């Protein structure tokens, strides 16, 4: 997972970033450590100076990954369009843990379970679950829109309409 280079776009469970430098720094013991530096792609004026770095050897632990591929987008929508596996159970405590894995494909069952739970519970759908679901859809919409060069709004609508079709 060390195949990151300057100019690459990367993502964590919240934002899309761009790597702008690779430098060697010293760790706390004075040993040289190769790090890459990145900043949010869409930083506000206040946050334009915000930068982050991560040792290249720790990228796997950082939660950062390359953006989903175009083939990954196709697989995502294909899985999203399939009916929900009836053996899956909605487990709210595991939802956030699974999201921190930052894997769009592994997010599909969680998203489908949240959506199904929303349909089944109607007005009683927990506000926290609603917020989590919207956060997932927003994050995926941002990433997929960036990769496919489509609008956020069209991807957001496509995700929601696919969820509706697969749950009927």
Where is each model-derived feature located?
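Short, surface-exposed secondary-structure edge patches
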Residues: 1-3, 26-27
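Short, well-ordered loop/turn sites that connect or cap secondary structure elements
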Residues: 3-4, 11
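Short, acidic/polar N-cap/turn motifs at the starts of alpha helices
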Residues: 7-9, 35
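Generic alpha-helical secondary structure signal
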Residues: 8, 21, 40-42
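Short glycine-/polar-rich loops that comprise or flank the Walker A/P-loop
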Residues: 14-15, 34
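Short beta-strand-centered aromatic/proline hotspots
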Residues: 15-25
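Short solvent-exposed strand/turn elements
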Residues: 27-57
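Charge/polar-rich, low-complexity and marginally structured segments
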Residues: 57-168
